């Protein structure tokens, strides 16, 4: 006997499943917001030269993407709390946001790597020996952003095959 897709038993999401989704998304929002705030508030002045995140377009993009991810993760956490998960668009939107966050983190990490170790072939010198506090804050922001990527990635994987929320 052939079972049709419409005849499959529907697995209903438990309260614990919904709590996990909400928690993942709220943690992702918090870590993404923290990364944006750390970078935006990060500056150091030495020998009359002030460095801050506006010196590099990649850091401006990093802050913007992290703020967008914060808003998205908080909004989808609210949707999960209202049991509106399992919509057809959610996994696709999750995948886009995870990839944006990963790209922003990778781009900022590449610039941070050059700042840390330099690149003699292109004439870029390591500046983290001079601006240690600035670089340490940048590294902390990258770690927070990577945590947001991982949390959003797990939420994205969970949204791929969602359990349907219980009907009330």
From Swiss-Prot:
Coiled-coil boundaries: none
Membrane topology category: Multi-pass membrane protein
Membrane-spanning residues: 18-38, 55-75, 96-116, 137-157
Cytoplasmic topological domain: 1-17, 76-95, 158-168
Residues making up the signal peptide according to the UniProt record: none
GO cellular component: plasma membrane
Subcellular location: Cell membrane
Topological domain ranges for the Extracellular compartment: 39-54, 117-136
Keyword Transmembrane helix: yes
Lineage: superkingdom: Eukaryota
Annotated keywords: Cell membrane, Membrane, Transmembrane, Transmembrane helix
Keyword Transmembrane among record annotations: yes
Oligomer and partners: Homodimer and heterodimers.
Record family assignment: Belongs to the Casparian strip membrane proteins (CASP) family.
Name listed for the protein in its UniProt record: CASP-like protein UU-1
Species annotation: Oryza sativa subsp. japonica (Rice)
